[in-house]
């Protein structure tokens, strides 16, 4: 009986200690309330892209074409780990369009494809125990705009709905600075097919009927906490 009473006392002490203000926080550091991410890296267009090649006068199909990407995120979190924010992304991918002539200008041309995304997101952030490592995920929906064209100046712009998700891991170098890596995804549904007005302006008009792009990226950069 004495042993049982002692165990009950120990349990009560543990429960009271855990419930005291500040004690739980001292055992498990809180997550930052505000986070800014500045990242750069590589991204891949996972969907099919069709490019007219001036050199052999044919359509070339590309899948998983790499490009350059940058992004900036701002997210605000509650103590529970749930939060909200806004995402801005920019992607650029170049394709070889071959040697040919547009009007009176001959030379090697590149097909340039750029993509902007802006939209709000819902996010969740957590710590790995009491360490300086943190992880976070987010999903959002916003506006995606595309620009495409050849060096000769044939350029088209179109946009539509964008859906994004992101998962990341980061390390806090200090209470205000960290470094991290994000896996990103962007799916966009646009008014033009993914082989579109630039090629139509050159007298080509073919499509696989899929109005949109799917892009995966891996980016790393700076984290700012406040």
Ranges and model annotations:
Residues 1-34:
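Cleavable N-terminal export/targeting peptides
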Residues 25-79, 83-84, 211, 215-226:
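Short glycine/proline- and aromatic-enriched beta-strand/turn motifs that initiate or cap beta-hairpins
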Residues 31, 77-81, 91, 127-131, ...:
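Outer-membrane beta-barrel channels and translocator barrels
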Residues 32-34, 64-68, 112-118, 133, ...:
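Residues that define the transmembrane beta-barrel architecture of outer-membrane proteins
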Residues 35-37, 81-83, 132-134, 168, ...:
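Membrane-spanning beta-strand positions in outer-membrane beta-barrel proteins
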Residues 42, 68-76, 88-90, 120-124, ...:
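Residues on the lipid-exposed face of transmembrane beta-strands in outer-membrane beta-barrel proteins
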Residues 49-51, 59, 93-97, 165, ...:
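Predominantly the C-terminal beta-signal and adjacent terminal strand-loop region
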Residues 54-61, 103-111, 148-156, 203-210:
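Extracellular loop and loop/strand-boundary signature of outer-membrane beta-barrel proteins
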